[in-house]
């Protein structure tokens, strides 16, 4: 299988600065997203989708690693599977929220459980959005764009390298 390098610029629109054409900056270039799922296939699919949009991506396969990586990298957004080994996604979200620098980072719950009661439990744990499996990539992309937009409620807009 051949994967296209999302940093390749041939398909990106050009911006002109000083009369010279330069590749336009990808939509998500300033943002780091942590993707957490215990399925390697889901991690690969979601990560590739995000990288093709220009987002920087880090991954974790369980809740404990998710907390550790979130603390180390301070991502702009977290996509969190709920049914995880070692520490479930709701527990990981609660632990992430204990860290001052991560309190306003949007967490999007991803799960096969779509019941209203389970959604309420996810929001009570501190998630900012909710997606059910199988994942609709268009819906996921729209939710991410909304949560990362400046002034989004529940979100601290902080592109990589810039702290509020």
Q: How would you label these PLM feature ranges?
A:
Residues 54-61, 69, 131:
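Short hydrophobic/Thr-rich beta-strand motif most characteristic of the beta2 strand and flanking loop
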Residues 128:
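Short, glycine/charged-rich "phosphate-handling" switch motifs in NTP-dependent
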């Amino acid at each position: 299988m051949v994967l296209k390098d999302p940093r390749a610029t041939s398909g990106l629109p050009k911006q002109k600065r000083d009369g010279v054409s330069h590749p336009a900056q990808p939509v998500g270039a300033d943002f780091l997203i942590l993707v957490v799922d215990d399925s390697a296939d889901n991690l690969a699919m979601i990560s590739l989708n995000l990288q093709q949009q220009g987002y920087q991506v880090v991954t974790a396969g369980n809740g404990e690693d998710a907390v550790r990586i979130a603390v180390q990298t301070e991502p702009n957004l977290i996509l969190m599977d709920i049914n995880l080994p070692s520490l479930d996604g709701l527990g990981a979200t609660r632990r992430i929220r204990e860290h001052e620098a991560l309190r306003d980072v949007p967490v999007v719950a991803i799960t096969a459980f779509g019941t209203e009661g389970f959604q309420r439990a996810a929001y009570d744990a501190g998630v900012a959005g909710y997606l059910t499996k199988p994942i609709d990539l268009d819906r996921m992309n729209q939710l991410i764009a909304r949560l990362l937009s400046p002034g989004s409620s529940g979100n601290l807009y902080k592109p990589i390298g810039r702290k509020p």
